[in-house]
Amino acid sequence: MKFSPSLLRGTLIKRYKRFFADVELEDGTIVTAHCPNTGAMSGCAEPGYTVFLSESTNPKRKLKYTWELAQTFDGHFIGINTHNANKLVAEALDNKVLKEFSDITRWKAEVTPPTANSRFDFALERENTQHQGIIEYMEVKSVTLAENSKGFFPDAVTQRGAKHCLELARLAESGIKTSLLFCVQHTAIESVQVAEYIDPTYAESVKKAADAGVSLLAASCIIDEQKILLNQTLPLIL
């Protein structure tokens, strides 16, 4: 996913009320940008970080700028916009980036299975040996919480996330293939694990999903101020 037009560079002054970030642009102008991340953003929003903003030309928007990237003091990039995770996965599916999904023939975003109560990020189709299309479902989570080289999810309690895991487990138990993909938008992260110390209920739901046969995996991203690309799988520690 390439950023076009180019992002604007600035310095983070502060993030507040979850959805707002004050940023000083390179020319000294101070602007308020939309923060498209409702999580705790621990370690992602330190005052003084270099940040990168996209600029909207839509006159109806209340905030002209959206916070897309942050760069830590030691140079690591973080994808702030959680909405980009699904875009990155869609692009990776099209380009056969991950071998686990290289035989996907078609996909559709935002789908509610006929027997489920939750909408999932993707319905995927593979062909079996009889060349019949088999549908499976995937949920995507964006990971940005880093401690040393380890990534953790979630960074805040997520009842919705736990519900999704249990729904994936129920589908898996009924014979439908399901997967949970952690999209790592932080270049310092080398492995991923569930943050049981933040949300033990979510951690338990992930374990139940794994026991039910849900496929769990994590994937890293290449990130710089021009682009974000899903790259390769990372170790996932349960």
From Swiss-Prot:
Q: Which InterPro entries match?
A: SfsA, SfsA_C, SfsA_N
Domain of life per record: Bacteria
Among the GO molecular function terms of this UniProt record, one is: DNA binding
CDD domains in the record:
SfsA-like_bacterial
Q: Where does the record place a coiled coil?
A: none
Q: State the family it belongs to.
A: Belongs to the SfsA family.
According to its UniProt record, what is one Pfam family this protein matches? SfsA_N
Q: Any idea what this protein is called? A: Sugar fermentation stimulation protein homolog
